[in-house]
Amino acid sequence: MLKKYLFLTKPGILFGNFITTLGGFFLAAQGSIDILLLLLTLIGTTLVVASGCVVNNVIDQDIDTKMQRTQNRALVKKTISPTVALVYAFVLGVMGFSILWFGVNGYAFLFAMIGFIVYVGFYSLWTKRTSIHQTVIGSISGASPPVIGYTAVTHQFDVAALLLFLAYALWQMPHSWAIAIYRFDDYKNAGIPILPVARSIYRTKIECVIYILLFAAVLNGLYCFGYTNVFFLITFNALTAYWFYLSIIGFKAENDQLWAKRFFLYSVILITLLSLSFSFTYQSPAPNLPLF
């Protein structure tokens, strides 16, 4: 019984957002970790993300029946009712937002709210079914957790927070498209107008190259503005260079699905290593460049 409710929250997404929240927190903390604040930030963010994922499951019931990857979800199999799922999402959301508001700060609460509203409203209810730009919209919600982690410590939105937001949003474009290429038939059967389906796999590969270059350019800004050290500069660019290499060899791939799987898995490794590296690649003291 409990397993059904756990999988309703999409544990893979929870883990990914847990890591990126941790990364933002590490960068801001500069080695001085407030354990209680860290725990409250991680728990609050995870609960909010879990709430959004449960609501997404409710919204996507009709789509999930058409996709092999999602045909066994609890709402599709009707082992959990939509009403129970929404109550579950409400409880998770109330707990998560309360922790961020009362235990962290208004900035963390604000960016959690932005991420939730974009994911549930603008992505799940609207653009996922209607627009080729759905991934751009969805990337806003995916880029919120590192900013939540960062502002939990700094109590302000500064240049580093902006760079984190932009970089993590840019990373999500090729990451998400790789899933769509790997599961191309699923997305096509469900009628989801994501780029590989709505345009072509070749066009998607071109845009993956562009977004990887933009991702690298933006995140190098952390070093240029003095937020990270030279070790970050070297290791980040080495890791990203290999991702870029994978994007280039994709044009000669004999099997697009196998290439996309490899490309996707490396994107996960990259963002995980990047986020964890902020625990020791920060530059202290960091510049004070607040935006609001």
UniProtKB/Swiss-Prot annotation:
Q: Name one GO cellular component term.
A: plasma membrane
Q: Supply the source organism's classification.
A: Bacteria, Pseudomonadati, Pseudomonadota, Gammaproteobacteria, Moraxellales
Q: Which Gene3D superfamilies match?
A: UbiA prenyltransferase
Q: Which gene encodes it?
A: cyoE
Name it. Answer: Protoheme IX farnesyltransferase
Which keywords has UniProt assigned to this entry? Cell inner membrane, Cell membrane, Heme biosynthesis, Membrane, Transferase, Transmembrane, Transmembrane helix
**HAMAP family with a match to the protein in the record:** CyoE_CtaB
Matching Pfam families: UbiA
Q: What else is known?
A: Carbon 2 of the heme B porphyrin ring is defined according to the Fischer nomenclature.
Source species = Acinetobacter baumannii (strain ATCC 17978 / DSM 105126 / CIP 53.77 / LMG 1025 / NCDC KC755 / 5377)
By its UniProt entry, which CDD domains does this protein fall under? PT_UbiA_Cox10
